């Protein structure tokens, strides 16, 4: 229900919203009435509409939400008039006006209601508060009457006469209430009348409730189902206070002048419903309550409600780089526009999110952490908003990040081994290149990005980087990647002293043993050479030598045993828990479901078994690592003993404790257990009953009545024996029963015998590091006693898991070290140890709670009253979790163990730090964990710094994007400090009011200033503003000057000696203005603060920068402002890019019109660099001297006789530094072009020439062979002695194919040789 009243809560609400709400008010036009009939204004009415801050070209008048008329004046103006004339029945209605700006029509003005003739319009009534939010501040009540020269009357409920009146010259009266007090509370209205007609009154304004806030504690405001919903969905806002019978009110900060929602309470709370949300319902809501005397509470915390159909996009950044070396840690930083919303990290290919950040830790800038990354962590990651309620809002992701893990198998070389360097990007590339910084000539190319580096003779070590090029720009290479250093093997740590000593003893004893053995052999060899009378001496020597050898061996064993060795704990698969649930508490056997839960996060399935019948069912593990086995109504077939197992990938757990179902009308038999009874100490007896909501009774054998009884306390109960003495010994059992009478009882448990035995004192037991660990950590337990030669047993949750044998060679204390190499999620729990000798055991040690974190979402940690405390005072740290029934631990950075433990029935606990001192200063965090399932814990809360001091640390004020901005631009002032959870306040020099940011949940406060105007110029500072009463001193921040540019002619900026300077030299910026008596400001792009300011006597300021460095490179400009108008500055000067380097950047080289020569055409090569005043030179491959010089960088290349073809590059030098040349540009190749006919002729000529060469070479070979034969034949002819020589034709049968018919003589002879005489 909407009550048509307004309420003042003196908390300066709209000041909290800063300039945002102010800008919104300024953009609303003003509407009023003028008439030339002062005694009867309805006879002739003109409506005026005025723009608040700018001229406009169009104005629009609306009546009853429909367009009535619009005016387009011939020139832009601030205000226009709409003539109405005499007021008649047709003219009555609701009027508003708008004006046109660059974004469209403005917001409508306030509604003017014209009623019947003879009546004045009803005035508008609202509040303005400009003072601090406590009784005693000043309040202005504003009444707007629409007409000028009216009499304004202020009335208060309970008074017949007006309490105040005014006759202003305008249309509005301001009634001031100074020093607000409780008697000023109540309901106010205002009325107007014409001065000449005191009997003609207007209608009363809407009533206004004046509530003095801060007299009651603030309520809490929550949203259901959540604070972020889609349009059309329903929302319920619940306001809850500590006091019954109050009236509750809901306000929206964006509409403070609109009526508020109010509700009568339901006990001490009220619900505000929104059936179908709209996007304009987005805003900041708060609530309060008040009594019948209008005494109000403090405002609740502001609750931001988002109504949107699409989430704003999130972005994801990787630190230090998306290409990460294996084994390192990586941070994935996720951010978005929404704060107070959970975030989830997703990996492509994975169904479930990898990590979560809860809503309380999301401040718009958060990080997920991947530790000790491997190649399994490589992939494409994205982050999304994570909601715990259902909604139809679409999720959007701005970007994804591909994480690349490089250097396989590591970045440490072993001589003779190889390492694969992997260069990766998230898009297709043409080719990768690998550079080695130690060798300039080294370069490798790869298509897939894998480079194999060998380390022969240790020569592969060094620093490598890679780059790539894409197909569309094949001549352009990317920037180099971050360098990766490959190093040789080195000592990465120190061996433990025990290991060094152990190894030294082994080597020493081995040398002694070998020496003595050689001595015995030498004596035996001598035996053969000695006389018999010396044999007894030899025997004695041999005996002594053997005795020494035996003693050495014995010492070896004793020395090795004297060293304390670490005993690795082989953790068994955790035992699951089995219990029963029912929806019939008085008759649970009517419907029973068995549940099995495992503490191990890697459990895949659960198996339920029944004794005598074996396997019953298998169920997959849920997200809570549990499974349900419904049995239904119990029958005789269900009776028996049940237990369950959990299955992992390679192991099956031990069976759970047996749950015995006896039958109908009888509850399952409970299980009883207790710790070791120790004389004179307290003893707790545990009775586990399998069902929720049961009563428990403890019995002692020989007594009929229960020894102790407990009501419904869950599935288990603990009976306490305050002091264990001899009379308490005996056999105990326990039973369970239903909560309500008539009781249904269980069978008695198995008996438990309690006997007090003689015991040694308990050992000293601790962990070497903190017992709060992350999965994968290394944990060592140290158990020791002052007694000698003791054996040790390590227990987890009362079960033995490891043991240590006695050490005989070490006098003094006995110690055992138990080691968990890599802690799993199921390894948490309560650990203890005992020691024993042959017959006597020790008392159990004090338990150590090993908490394995990162299983549940992290809690939040807050300090009350605040994180800054005076020495000697108390502070309460509240740890707020998510789940009920958890146990909480408080940790301090640098402390070995948690400071405090507490168990909670709700979701939060309070840790008290009493009388804090300097030693309590530091970072605190908390964690919660469940004690029933291996101490599975949450992530650690965000650290909270506790300051023990009498003075707040000084914050720092900065501007984003810069403190020098143009008129109309938006700027955000950031107040940053190390103290968390404290509000900030922003001061402007010369103004009494301040902008406040309440309940900051981060360590920085944002103060946005929208649409910078002349009123925004000034000097600002900020300080902390704690929301608790504290005597701690507050220091102001630095002073920031907000300068607005664009109001004076721009100056000129020069630099001497030039835009490029060698590191270590000096440079001077000269800023020349046009007006005298000016202050000059030097600016650098990318920095938020000015570099330097000067007030010279003339028109120019010289900014001297001595010994410049590389980081001084950048883009500079300057502005100036007059002393008569400080901080109202000129336009920016021209920008100057400064290079501080001894090697100018390389230029670019391009060809026009193309890189292909055409017949008779030239090509112009264009060399361009980033610096002015340079000389360019063009180089052609193959020519020693540069070819051409040019000041403008243009080179004309001709192709006479094909001399223009080839690779070109260019470089330049500054005229101020003629000896310093830049790097050469990337090479550019010019090629020639031939027509199709010429190309075909060329190819034909090449083919023909090749054939001619082959033929000529073949003929030459044949002629050479024949030439060699000729002298040999001639010599044989001279040696025939007159006989005819014959040439045997042995190849005659080879003229035809074998086996074919032929007419040759050879075929008839069938292979017989035929000789034919040939004259030579």
UniProtKB/Swiss-Prot annotation:
Cystine bridges: 49-97, 334-383, 423-466, 783-833, 879-926, 1071-1118, 1167-1210
Keyword rRNA-binding listed: no
Topological region Cytoplasmic: 526-534
Keyword Transferase assigned: no
Transmembrane segments: 505-525, 535-555
GO MF annotation terms: activin receptor antagonist activity; coreceptor activity; inhibin binding
Domain Ig-like C2-type: 29-113, 115-212, 224-308, 312-399, 401-482, 572-665, 662-756, 761-853, 857-942, 949-1044, 1049-1134, 1145-1226
Signal peptide: 1-18
GO biological process: immune response-regulating signaling pathway; negative regulation of activin receptor signaling pathway; regulation of DNA-templated transcription
Tissue spec: Expressed in pituitary gland, testis and liver. Isoform 2 is expressed pituitary gland and testis.
Gene Ontology CC terms: extracellular region; membrane
Alphabetical UniProt keywords: Disulfide bond, Glycoprotein, Immunoglobulin domain, Membrane, Receptor, Repeat, Secreted, Signal, Transmembrane, Transmembrane helix
Residues that carry a glycan: 44, 329, 365, 372, 591, 731, 782, 830, 874, 923, 970, 1011, 1066, 1131, 1207
Ranges of the Extracellular topological domain: 19-504, 556-1320
Family annotation (InterPro entries): Ig-like_dom, Ig-like_dom_sf, Ig-like_fold, Ig-like_Receptors_ImmuneReg, Ig_sub, Ig_sub2
Role this protein plays: Seems to be a coreceptor in inhibin signaling, but seems not to be a high-affinity inhibin receptor. Antagonizes activin A signaling in the presence or absence of inhibin B. Necessary to mediate a specific antagonistic effect of inhibin B on activin-stimulated transcription.
Quaternary state and interactors: Interacts with INHA; the interaction is not confirmed by standard receptor binding assays. Interacts with ACVR1B; the interaction appears to be ligand-dependent as it is diminished by inhibin B and activin A. Interacts with ACVR2A, ACVR2B, ACVRL1 and BMPR1B. Interacts with HECTD1.
Protein name: Immunoglobulin superfamily member 1
Source species taxonomy: Eukaryota, Metazoa, Chordata, Craniata, Vertebrata
Gene field: Igsf1
